């Protein structure tokens, strides 16, 4: 790129949109080395403009780890991707250092710098008529394909318009907290709690599609803002390429292995399930789902592994912490869970389990018309305490009635 040699200290995401039937690169294997590597980078071609370097080690294709895959398997995955493909790559020198020091790459530290579309942080101060926009449930918006809250009907000259908010923006975070799996009323409440000013992390449709292709949450953009550039030499800005409309890749295999988003409303006897864990092993899972109870109606099943509680990943959290998160949720809780077979599949494929892989939640009836985010709000906001739960433990397991 401009004759300079770039060196990165972290993995990086590169987004390629095919032009003229080509991505502008080839794949190779190296004798005596594990993995697949990039080669034959076409000068000023799609791959080069996206930030791909010769001899880059290919770590992921569209969010799926391919470090142990054969050359033929990787080629097939790229072909199946169609016109758009997302690579997680490591440059030659960084790869060499990590191999020598036996350091494993962490995908959450990946640089987002080269991606052509980025989330936006929108800071607003409330005007006399509020912020000047409507918030509507995303499952109504055809084409989004995921749960979330969409910006609509921005008033001309309003704080929202002046701050750069756009119609159809998807809200990812409110005041630094992820709202990707929260329901409509919860997001509205978070905005109102901000008082006379609020900060929204939003994505347009192109950006949302791109991050979902990588199986990355746009919320990681906050983290990327706090990390160093990750390059010894400043990388030139990538040339934006328009998003091509193409047939979706064949996802038959993944369709059989989906996580589930379940929104539970607490009943008189709690949520109607037990939370279980095996001592000494990570993870908490669902047991004893009561037929006809809130958990059953929401789609929870015995042996479901809990991935997220209200948008927070809890896979590595201690059992007691997960119990506390659910109990402190009040009358409603949103869980991202995975059946045992699906969980084992994602673990084997090294695919991170994120909410964007799940089918979106149904839109609550009272949120279909959207509500104006304005200055008026209830003065009595006290929440009822969660009722007491029964907890049991044995020598090798934990079990709490929820």
From Swiss-Prot:
It comes from the Eukaryota. One of its GO terms (molecular function) is protein-membrane adaptor activity. One of its GO terms (cellular component) is apical plasma membrane. Residues 240-250 have a biased composition (Polar residues). Residues 230-258, 362-402 are annotated as: Disordered. Residues 12-93, 121-206, 261-341 form the PDZ domain. Residues 365-387 have a biased composition (Basic and acidic residues). The keyword Calcium does not apply. Keywords: Repeat. The keyword Repeat applies. One of its GO terms (biological process) is protein localization to plasma membrane. Residues 388-402 have a biased composition (Low complexity). CDD domains: PDZ_NHERF-like (cd06768). Belongs to the NHER family. This is Putative PDZ domain-containing protein PDZK1P1. The gene is PDZK1P1.
């Amino acid at each position: 790129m401009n004759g300079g040699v770039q060196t990165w200290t972290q993995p990086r995401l590169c987004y390629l949109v095919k032009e003229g039937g080509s991505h502008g690169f080839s794949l190779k294997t190296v004798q005596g080395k594990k993995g697949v590597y990039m080669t034959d980078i076409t000068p000023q071609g799609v791959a080069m403009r996206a930030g791909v370097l010769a001899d880059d080690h290919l770590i992921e294709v569209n969010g799926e780890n391919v470090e142990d895959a054969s050359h033929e398997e990787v080629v097939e995955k790229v072909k199946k991707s169609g016109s758009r493909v997302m690579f997680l790559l490591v440059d030659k020198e960084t790869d060499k250092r990590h191999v020598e020091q036996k350091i494993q790459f962490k995908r959450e530290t990946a640089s987002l710098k080269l991606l052509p579309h980025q989330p936006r942080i929108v800071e607003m101060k409330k005007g006399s008529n509020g912020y000047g926009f409507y918030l509507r449930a995303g499952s109504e918006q055809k084409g989004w394909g995921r749960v979330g809250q969409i910006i609509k009907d921005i008033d001309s000259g309003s704080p929202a318009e002046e701050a750069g908010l756009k119609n159809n923006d998807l809200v990812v975070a409110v005041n630094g907290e992820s709202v990707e799996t929260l329901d409509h009323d919860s997001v509205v409440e978070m905005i109102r709690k901000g008082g006379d000013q609020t900060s929204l992390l939003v994505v347009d449709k192109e950006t949302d599609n791109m991050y979902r292709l990588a199986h990355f949450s746009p919320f990681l953009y906050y983290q990327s803002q706090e990390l160093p550039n990750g390059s010894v030499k400043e990388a030139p800005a990538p040339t934006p390429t328009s998003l091509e409309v193409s047939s979706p890749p064949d996802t038959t295999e993944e369709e059989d292995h989906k996580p589930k988003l379940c929104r539970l409303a607490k009943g008189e006897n709690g949520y109607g399930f037990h939370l279980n864990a095996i001592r000494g092993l990570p993870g908490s899972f669902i047991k004893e789902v009561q037929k006809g109870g809130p958990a059953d109606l929401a789609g929870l099943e015995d042996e479901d592994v809990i991935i997220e509680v209200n948008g927070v990943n809890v896979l590595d959290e201690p059992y007691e912490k997960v119990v506390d998160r659910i109990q402190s949720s009040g009358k409603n809780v949103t869980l991202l869970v995975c059946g045992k077979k699906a969980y084992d599949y994602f673990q084997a494929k090294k695919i991170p389990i994120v909410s964007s892989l799940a089918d979106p939640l149904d839109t609550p009836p009272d949120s279909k018309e959207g509500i104006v985010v304005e200055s008026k709000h209830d003065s009595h906001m006290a929440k009822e305490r969660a009722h007491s739960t029964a907890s049991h433990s044995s020598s090798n397991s934990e079990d709490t009635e929820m």
